[in-house]
Amino acid sequence: MIQLPFIQRLKWEEYMALFLGFFFVIFEKLLSCLAFMIHNTLGLFYRSVVRNEIKKRSKKRSRSRSVSLQRAKAIHDAADIREMCKISGYYVEDHLVRTEDDYILCIHRISKDSPGRIGSPHPKKLPVVYCHHGLLMNSEVWVCNVDPRNCLVFDLVNKGYDVWLGNNRGNKYSRQHLRFDSTDKEFWDFSIDDFAQYDIPDTIDYILKTSGQTKLTYIGFSQGTAQAFASLSIHPLLNDKINSLIALAPAISPKGLHNRVVDAFVKARPSILFFLFGRKSILPSAGFWQSFLAPKFFDAVLAYCLSQLFNWSCQNISSYQRLVSFAHLYSYTSVKCLVHWFQIMRSAEFRMYDNDQLGHDYFLKYYKAAKFPTNNIRTPIYLIWGGSDSLVDIQAMLNALPAEVEHVKVDSYEHLDMIWADTVKDYVIPPVLRRLRDIHHPPEHEENDKENREIQKNHIAPRNKPI
């Protein structure tokens, strides 16, 4: 028999969460229908206004500023990662990974060579670096920097590393399954457990086999770090295939959200959240809103949401970079995955997904979902985290990880600053390169980077201006 959340005993916060969530879903549906009816006329008007505004501003800017503006617009309008990389003179090889449970993941190999050369394995056997994105994202977030000097991926390619970008099941590049269609409920029946059990280890095995290497360096951002922690904790042999885990804005057990009402909503029982959002993709209309709204308005809406949910100001990210980044920020994932994160916030522990069949807090003293045994990880871990990041509880993270973890704090950085701030080239890329040099012999033709010598363990020395 199906249990409906409104006939269960709920706390008053959960009744409020149910009411607000129901109101939000209905309001968003009505607004979507209205917007769809006027999309062809008003949407085109919005975009023409923005284009004219960009043209006017570009005439008033200096030549260098105008080039940045044109580059920002080109990246903003790029349809996929291949177009985005081509703007900066890089090329993309697409590779398909079949997971053990039959999802087809599209991953990308970034190169400065022409697309005609598909060198697998690479004749020089370059050190392999595998980068993985965060929640509700895809591989594009790594290459949408307006200033290419702030792009970690491009810098690694320039330094002679064999760079691969992963994608989670369900996102823009990984919506295929051998038995299910993306419109099927079964396709979206996955959580962080499945990323850890299948996506990460199967992708790593493919990359190592294709590159001819026995080990790689894993660089994760946000949920990409949590997936690695979880996967390494439940796959002991995977630890022998990763020489170092570099975690940018690492996430294991966020404290919660800045807005108390929304925080109560997200910590509600899964039955409530599934009742409101269904059991497929979370907010499938987000792509429509992005295409409908003027870029500046879409940027303002997202900035407001980030401020309300996480208390982020995005002060370290330029206005151009924010417009570009937000255009490539969202990608699909399952409602179940988001529910899993809400369960982690609710328990304040990095646990496996809980189906919540028992339904009441009373039973929690008899039953809890298993914790990921992250203390068992043998791979060397290097954390780079922001002092103003509301999603990072560094002490809780250090308690959950092995004692040998090294970490670097960037004082004023928020979560998204780790990949998009104007000073990534000063405060993120140098410690990453230093860590890689500690692991590998310098690749052929690598230039000395004086910046790395200014990096000290657990500290980054400011250059010219404080962080």
From Swiss-Prot:
Glycans are attached at N311, N316. It comes from the Eukaryota. The modification Phosphoserine is found at S66. Residues 440-457 have a biased composition (Basic and acidic residues). Its EC number is 3.1.1.-. GO terms for molecular function: sterol ester esterase activity. Residues 1-17 are cytoplasmic. The keyword S-adenosyl-L-methionine does not apply. Residues 440-467 are annotated as: Disordered. This is Probable lipase C1672.09. It comes from Schizosaccharomyces pombe (strain 972 / ATCC 24843).
